[in-house]
Amino acid sequence: MSSKEQKTPEGQAPEEIITEQHEEVEAVEPDASAEQVDPRDEKIANLEAQLTEAQNREREGVLRVKAEMENLRRRTELDVEKAHKFALEKFVNELLPVIDSLDRALEVADKANPDMTAMVEGLELTLKSMLDVVRKFGVEVVAETNVALDPNVHQAIAMVESEDVAAGNVLAVMQKGYTLNGRTIRAAMVTVAKAKG
């Protein structure tokens, strides 16, 4: 008998059995691989998740640093602006006693005496020109009466009964106050009106 003629007990040639078994193995392999997860695929998935997480952290860090830099830039601009705006504060503080002295000299000057007229005019012009100069740089005088007491620019030193001025308003200014670009350099010392009673 030739090998082709040899049959297995079931009546199949050995090549047919091998082919059938090979097909069965191929048919079984996809099912087995579907159930088994390759550890390399699992590791790749873990690494991809870690990479995504690291990228997100890095992106958040970059955004945080950008925001901090923008805030720092803004704060620096404000600081420089304030420094420019209030650089004169010390200088103006040094000028205030001179302005006060000129004010006091005008208050006590004998304006009725004709011999003092030239001196009084000189003091008035000096004071006016000095106030004009400091106004150019943002200095304002706080000396109004009959205005509401503002604790930001007024320092109340006494309360006096008054019929002419509403209660809580400035009755008299004892010492002028000054502001530089809206910031109080020296509060005005004032007396405040209170209702008669």
From Swiss-Prot:
It is found in: Cytoplasm. Keywords: Chaperone, Cytoplasm, Stress response. One of its GO terms (cellular component) is cytosol. The keyword Cytoplasm applies. InterPro entries: GrpE, GrpE_coiled_coil, GrpE_head. Residues 1-41 are annotated as: Disordered. PROSITE patterns: GRPE (PS01071). One of its GO terms (molecular function) is protein-folding chaperone binding. It holds the Pfam family GrpE. Gene3D superfamilies: 3.90.20.20, Head domain of nucleotide exchange factor GrpE. One of its GO terms (biological process) is protein folding. The keyword Chaperone applies. It comes from the Bacteria. PANTHER family: GRPE PROTEIN, GRPE PROTEIN HOMOLOG, MITOCHONDRIAL. Belongs to the GrpE family. Homodimer. Participates actively in the response to hyperosmotic and heat shock by preventing the aggregation of stress-denatured proteins, in association with DnaK and GrpE. It is the nucleotide exchange factor for DnaK and may function as a thermosensor. Unfolded proteins bind initially to DnaJ; upon interaction with the DnaJ-bound protein, DnaK hydrolyzes its bound ATP, resulting in the formation of a stable complex. GrpE releases ADP from DnaK; ATP binding to DnaK triggers the release of the substrate protein, thus completing the reaction cycle. This is Protein GrpE. It comes from Enterobacter sp. (strain 638).
